[in-house]
Amino acid sequence: MPFAEYFAAVWAGTSAELRGSAGSGVSGTLGDLLVLARELQAPTRLAKETLDEARAVQFPGLDGVLPGFGRQTPNDWGLGLEVRDAKSPHWTGARNSPRTFGHFGRSGTFLLVDPDAGIALACLTDRPFGDWAVDAWPRLADAVLMERGS
């Protein structure tokens, strides 16, 4: 199935649009991002096995650079989802569990899921990713977890 058809099937009923590359060309609303957050917590559109594979570390021990946060040893990733593990510094909060996973981008947007805390956190901004996010995002994630008592 061509990717555009797959995208349309998965995102049916939302305003999400594919405007270019799957890696950086998805546009949508906060509501659309929350649909994805719910799906990543309790899949109904994806097979549970697909989600399990997507959030599982694919190449254990592979080092790399986490944009804005520097070299990470290791820099674990699933299939399109970054896995927090023991990375430091990191864009999620210090209180987030190592099983936390998600993705962020140049648009200043992120989505994380912390399965141990039972939360998802989505953030949309009108500012491109930069130094401001390196400071603000971990503090936001920690504040949400503190508010929940996690």
Where are the language model's segments positioned?
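Catalytic loop of the DD-peptidase/beta-lactamase superfamily, centered on the K-T-G motif
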Residues: 1-150
